[in-house]
Curated annotation (Swiss-Prot):
PANTHER family: PEPTIDASE U32 FAMILY, TRNA HYDROXYLATION PROTEIN P
Listed Gene3D superfamilies: Translation factors
Lineage: Bacteria, Pseudomonadati, Pseudomonadota, Gammaproteobacteria, Pasteurellales
Superkingdom, natural source: Bacteria
Protein family (similarity comment): Belongs to the peptidase U32 family.
Record-level GO BP terms: proteolysis; tRNA processing
GO cellular component: cytosol
Entry keyword tRNA processing: yes
Record EC number: 3.4.-.-
Protein's recorded name: tRNA hydroxylation protein P
Classification via PROSITE patterns: PEPTIDASE_U32 (PS01276)
Functional description taken from the UniProt entry: Involved in prephenate-dependent formation of 5-hydroxyuridine (ho5U) modification at position 34 in tRNAs, the first step in 5-carboxymethoxyuridine (cmo5U) biosynthesis.
Pfam families: Peptidase_U32, Peptidase_U32_C
Amino acid sequence: MTTQFKPELLSPAGSLKNMRYAFAYGADAVYAGQPRYSLRVRNNEFNHANLKIGIDEAHSLGKKFYVVVNIAPHNSKLKTFIKDLQPVIDMKPDALIMSDPGLIMLVRENFPNIDIHLSVQANAVNWATVKFWKQMGLTRVILSRELSIDEIAEIRQQVPDIELEIFVHGALCMAYSGRCLLSGYINKRDPNQGTCTNACRWEYKMEEGTTDDVGNIVPKIDPAQQIEVKNVAPTLGEGAVTDKVFLYTESQKPDEQMTAFEDKHGTYFMNSKDLRAVQHVEKLTALGVHSLKIEGRTKSFYYCARTAQVYRKAIDDAAAGKPFDESLMDTLESLAHRGYTEGFLRRHTHDEYQNYEYGYSISDRQQFVGEFTGKRNEQGMAEVAVKNKFLLGDNVEMMTPQGNINFKIEKMLNRKNETVDAALGDGHFVFLNVPQDINLNYALLMRNLVNTNTRNPHSN
């Protein structure tokens, strides 16, 4: 059964290049942060000049561009807010994504015609909250990641005349929809001001502690007691409760000790798995969710391209009434990730949300190794700008907006027209044989991995 309704595919844009790849692979819209006022102050290419370029390019393609203004501002940020926002408003973005009621009030007073989308940072978790923000004049609410599909359905039923947006892919925060103080506490970098250092991903050590005469937790001086967190299996509610107290340290700051406790649920460590909800696109489409959002403004252009391609197909299939293509789940395994979870869309045990073993992203399926430049040599071979090492004889996938092909590398030339057996890494260029009728614009190259992973891609 086909449906006229098709959700918007909303991709992250940490740079103009990421935006262009997202659009090429099927995104309907992108979001990017305003300087000083978004939660991605670090790794944000978008100054006012680039925002103008991005918004104009998006509109020329019939796409949309949303500007994120979602910090929790202190008084000092209010002094220049309207003055700083005026040039952005003049660029005519399609909406502002905002969380702070005070900033929203100022925008409504000064720029009444701009659409405002409520940021996930505002933690909208019930239909009454959504209805309130509709009455305040907002046109879309980005629902909290902590909601189940049934709760989303009830919100849709109770407030049918406002747009809803849901995160379907990307990193999850161990705090409630990102409202975290961990980085501020440990590293003096306030996540709510856009300077999160991802302290929840760091590697920590645990050692047994003891309590002193006044009840403070202090080190138990016995180096033999020191253990690695990753070697301790979590109890996850099944182990016996312990009255032991612990101290933990981050590997880069061994002299700074923090306290930890264990209860019937285990010791709480903070590394969430990544969200992957492509299998729920059909259901979310049927519910009338207007926008399906991919997290990742600090991710690579390859990530933007691959996620856009996968979720584009899932949305198109759902709108056409086609059954879910389970191979899309496997395709997303090719991206480096911290383990996948469905998040809170369905209820799971604790270990299905958390990764207790490592904090880095990894894939054992593929590694992104090259970007096609669009050029061909006199023999018609396509040029690749190498990003990671690959070898003659490797099996690779070539990804393009028109479709993907797999092949084995049987010949490579360098720019001197010399035969080479290795593309050595970033900064090198090689030529490969690919079909002449393939459009090389936005084409990417991935190496298929066998019995290895992206942490040690050439270990076998």
